[in-house]
From Swiss-Prot:
Organism superkingdom: Bacteria
Keyword Plastid recorded: no
InterPro entries: ARFGAP/RecO, DNA_rep/recomb_RecO_N, NA-bd_OB-fold, RecO, RecO_C
Family: Belongs to the RecO family.
Gene Ontology biological process terms from the UniProt entry: DNA recombination; double-strand break repair
UniProt keyword RNA-binding, yes or no: no
Protein name (database record): DNA repair protein RecO
Alphabetical list of Pfam families matching this protein: RecO_C, RecO_N
This protein's GO CC annotations: bacterial nucleoid
Secretion signal, residue range per the UniProt entry: none
Annotated NCBIfam families: reco
Gene that produces this protein: recO
Function recorded in the entry: Involved in DNA repair and RecF pathway recombination.
Length: 250
């Protein structure tokens, strides 16, 4: 079978002496791992089209239940300036990691595809990039169904008011935070009203609005810590990640 789709490279892994396994988020087929023959050779026909974050039109062949093979990759937009900004590249790589782990393979998700593509386009402008990375994480969690309910307690389901706590993937009320026995790894952590308010507001924002948003350093750091804890809880991976090893090409 022959397939064609728009795709964004999320990561690549060396395979053998000159080959690669490339992980894509595609417009039509969702998350795919594809085999690329000899792209690491100097005269490879793929050129730089398999570099992380590259947006391309790709063609591939093979049966769906096997490792399919890339036969053509034409760059639409390279996003090279993002790769060349080391700090920004690390930030986007961290966000991509949870997408790779959370998204089921070969399940189309055009909403997530366009979220990533449009976020990368805005990130190239270098206007408040932290806002766009935060937006990508929150919206990505929401699209994938991993964003916690911030309106009702995850235990008693009562409306959340005044004081908020986080435990085991849920936002809970003050009463439930003290009336249940929690394991040492799931002890309720206080969450500020500012974080809850920001979660609610982000759900209504658009990408072109983000460059006008001012988030205080204190609130931004609180939000990042909350998201880091939540992603660690629901996906179960270490908070530290060797970005060089997991997303960049050799």
């Amino acid at each position: 079978m022959h397939y064609s789709t728009e795709a964004i490279v999320l990561k690549n892994i060396p395979y053998g002496e000159a080959d690669l396994i490339v992980t894509y988020l595609t417009k039509n087929y969702g998350l795919l791992n594809l085999f690329a023959k000899s792209p690491r050779k100097i005269k490879s026909r793929f050129g730089s089209s398999l570099e992380p974050l590259t947006y391309s039109q790709i063609s591939f062949i093979g049966k769906e239940d096997n490792l399919q093979k890339i036969i053509q990759s034409d760059i639409i937009h390279p996003f090279q300036t993002i790769r060349e900004n080391y700090r920004l590249f690390l930030q986007i790589a961290n966000a991509l990691r949870f997408l790779i782990q959370a998204l089921p393979k070969k399940e189309p998700n055009s909403e997530l595809f366009y979220l990533l593509l449009n976020t990368l386009l805005y990130l190239e402008k270098r206007i408040k990039p932290d806002n766009y990375i935060l937006f990508l994480k929150v919206r990505g969690l929401s699209i994938l169904g991993y964003l916690p309910d911030f309106k009702n307690c995850g235990v008693c389901r009562q409306e959340l008011k005044e004081e908020f706590y986080y435990s085991s993937g849920f936002i809970i009320c003050k009463k439930c935070s003290s009336s249940y026995h929690y394991s040492s790894s799931a002890l309720p952590i206080p969450i500020s009203q500012g974080v809850i308010k920001l979660l609610k507001e982000i759900s209504t924002w658009t990408l072109n609005f983000l460059e006008r948003v001012k988030i205080s350093d204190k609130l931004f750091n609180e939000m990042e810590k909350f998201l880091q804890n939540h992603i660690f809880t629901v996906l179960g991976y270490n908070k530290t990640w060797d970005t060089e090893k997991n997303i960049t090409a050799s």
